[in-house]
From Swiss-Prot:
Biological function: One of the primary rRNA binding proteins. Required for association of the 30S and 50S subunits to form the 70S ribosome, for tRNA binding and peptide bond formation. It has been suggested to have peptidyltransferase activity; this is somewhat controversial. Makes several contacts with the 16S rRNA in the 70S ribosome.
Record's subunit section: Part of the 50S ribosomal subunit. Forms a bridge to the 30S subunit in the 70S ribosome.
Molecular functions (GO terms): rRNA binding; structural constituent of ribosome; transferase activity
Keywords: Ribonucleoprotein, Ribosomal protein, RNA-binding, rRNA-binding
The name this protein goes by in its record: Large ribosomal subunit protein uL2
Cited InterPro entries: NA-bd_OB-fold, Rib_uL2_dom2, Ribosomal_uL2, Ribosomal_uL2_bac/org-type, Ribosomal_uL2_C, Ribosomal_uL2_CS, Ribosomal_uL2_dom3, Ribosomal_uL2_RNA-bd_dom
Protein family according to the UniProt entry: Belongs to the universal ribosomal protein uL2 family.
The organism of origin for this protein: Xanthomonas oryzae pv. oryzae (strain KACC10331 / KXO85)
GO CC aspect terms: large ribosomal subunit
Gene name tied to this protein: rplB
Single Gene Ontology BP annotation: cytoplasmic translation
HAMAP family: Ribosomal_uL2_B (MF_01320_B)
Region of interest (Disordered), ranges: 224-275
Length: 275
């Protein structure tokens, strides 16, 4: 998809870069697959901030996505490709031969009129979902389950892709874009192909307001705060952080410090993403 720049009628338009998406549906989404969602502003039930830099933004409906793809052996036709404000990837509206409709993450190359199917004996074709035990080694996949039947959890963002590099016993080995090598049960399902809208990372919002429309608030440097608010705060004029190593607002070392706590699943990581 080509990139679009704008006439520099303002600083925000001068800097903006958008991806041209002529194939996206221009009408309303399928109403039966919409759900309401309310804003939290990053606060919990006590009203305290638990997630920083969240607040405001345009109101959106949640699109109910079928991450399980458990209608086995029933072919479905792609009615259209749609924009989803809740994720970077586009979504595809499927219509099964029995009349049921659902949304899925749209793989790269999938277009209106294509046919997809899920099942153990599905052909190796973009958009089809089948267990890892039936997918040839070397195939690029996305939307992979971590536990059989739980639904897709890995590689769901725009342009995401994972390569199936090995299969031994009850586990398949995957190579993620981060460089991590990970084992997953061979009964877990995956969808063939990579996620579409792969040029999303080339977009430039152009102005701070476009970020606010998306519900993202500004990030303030710790060194610009007071000592009560951040370990880097305080000092006269432009003082440094004052620590031998930079830390988070809660004093945890940052910039490469490992914070992973789940030792139980560490055995499934064959190679760390840091190399």
């Amino acid at each position: 998809m080509p990139l679009m720049k704008f006439k520099p009628t303002s600083p925000g338009r001068r800097s903006a870069v958008r991806v041209v998406t002529p194939d996206l549906h221009k009408g309303a989404p399928h109403a039966a697959l919409l759900d309401s969602q309310s804003k939290s502003g990053g606060r919990n039930h006590h009203g305290r901030i638990t997630v920083r830099h969240v607040g405001g933004g345009h109101k959106q409906h949640y699109r109910i996505i079928d991450f399980k793809r458990n209608k086995e052996g029933i072919p479905a036709r792609v009615e259209r490709i749609e924009y989803d404000p809740n994720r970077t990837a586009h979504i595809a509206l499927l219509c099964y031969v029995d009349g049921e409709r659902c949304y899925i993450i749209a793989p790269k190359g999938l277009k209106a009129g294509d046919q997809v199917i899920a099942g153990a004996n599905a052909p190796i074709k973009t958009g089809n979902t089948l267990p890892l035990r039936n997918i040839p080694v070397g195939t690029t996949v996305h939307g992979i389950e971590l536990k059989p039947g739980k639904g897709a959890q890995i590689a769901r963002a725009a342009g995401a892709a994972v390569q199936l590099v090995a299969r031994e016993g009850i586990y398949a080995t995957l190579r993620l874009r981060s460089g991590e090598m990970r084992k997953v049960p061979v009964e877990c399902r995956a969808t063939i192909g990579e996620v579409g809208n792969d040029e999303h990372n080339l977009e430039k919002l152009g102005k701070a307001g476009a970020k606010r429309w998306r519900g993202v608030r500004p990030t303030v440097r710790g060194a610009a705060m007071n000592p009560v608010d951040h370990p880097h705060g305080g000092g006269e004029a432009k003082a440094g952080q004052g620590n031998p190593h930079p830390v988070t607002p809660w004093g945890v070392p940052t910039k490469g410090y490992k914070t992973r706590k789940n030792k139980r699943t560490q055995q499934f990581i064959v190679r760390d993403r840091r190399g």
